[in-house]
Amino acid sequence: MQIIDGKSVSAKVKEYVKNEAISLKKSGITPTLAVILVGEDKASQTYVASKEKACLACEMGSVMHRLSKETSQSELLALIEVLNLDDSIDGILVQLPLPKHIDTNRVLEAIDPTKDVDGFHAVNVGKLSSGLDGFVPCTPLGIMELLKEYDVNLQGIDAVVIGRSNIVGKPMASLLLNAGATISIAHSKTKNLPEITRRAKLVVVAVGRPNFLNADMVSDGAIVIDVGINRLDSGKLVGDVDFDSVAPKCSLITPVPGGVGPMTIAMLLSNTLKSAKNRKRNV
């Protein structure tokens, strides 16, 4: 059993991004990410601060827009339009969740697809499902980078993705399918789930339930990717996988914390760099 080290892989990605950003700066371009935070959600504030810190560490520009929770949808859309038209901005990220009075889909669709570094716009979703080049959501993209780094051959592999969200489950399935894997998409209500997961060589779990996947649900030698991050009443941070029981059966497994998590911000930086390069070519 080998534990996948997301921290070291993310550090490699960030080092590459930093070197590329320095090169772009020499031609007068600073890859820049604009982040919009609406409200005072503590978790969102933490995420936004970590994104800002990561940008600066990688020699990238960071523009923060902190709006009150009373901000109207029209005000938010107006800000997005300003950022869409600003040539100094390469990536636009709206931190989720948004207050209930704002239509999340309407906001995400307002972002210029060429600056949609989260990969949530319908244009980028369509490109991914069609196997075309666009922006891919950062968490599944980070998982693909981990699998590549650990030399996992996806051609013909039986893979199960547990979770059907637009942020992880669906794009993860598309990426694996595009890479030649044979895909099953399951979720917390799938019948006979253990039978399905035991047939798989690769299991990706993203259901948001602590210790959801147990040892009886995986085959010997399986590769298990845990996307979950859950805080127990005790304060302990755990994933969707019962790590202690599942890990001994695996050939590869991601821990929580330190597995998939660090890759998400690394790939956000990578997507922002990609946008800056694309925009430079189109000048």
Curated annotation (Swiss-Prot):
EC number(s) reported in the record: 1.5.1.5, 3.5.4.9
Q: Which UniProt keywords apply?
A: Amino-acid biosynthesis, Histidine biosynthesis, Hydrolase, Methionine biosynthesis, Multifunctional enzyme, NADP, One-carbon metabolism, Oxidoreductase, Purine biosynthesis
Report any Pfam family annotated for this entry.
THF_DHG_CYH_C
**What does the record give as the reaction this protein catalyses?**
(6R)-5,10-methylene-5,6,7,8-tetrahydrofolate + NADP(+) = (6R)-5,10-methenyltetrahydrofolate + NADPH; (6R)-5,10-methenyltetrahydrofolate + H2O = (6R)-10-formyltetrahydrofolate + H(+)
Gene3D superfamilies the record matches: Leucine Dehydrogenase, chain A, domain 1, NAD(P)-binding Rossmann-like Domain
* Pathway the protein acts in: One-carbon metabolism; tetrahydrofolate interconversion
**GO CC, alphabetical:** cytosol
> PROSITE patterns under this entry?
THF_DHG_CYH_1, THF_DHG_CYH_2
Complex and partners? Homodimer.
Function recorded in the entry: Catalyzes the oxidation of 5,10-methylenetetrahydrofolate to 5,10-methenyltetrahydrofolate and then the hydrolysis of 5,10-methenyltetrahydrofolate to 10-formyltetrahydrofolate.
Q: Which family does it belong to?
A: Belongs to the tetrahydrofolate dehydrogenase/cyclohydrolase family.
- Protein name per UniProt: Bifunctional protein FolD
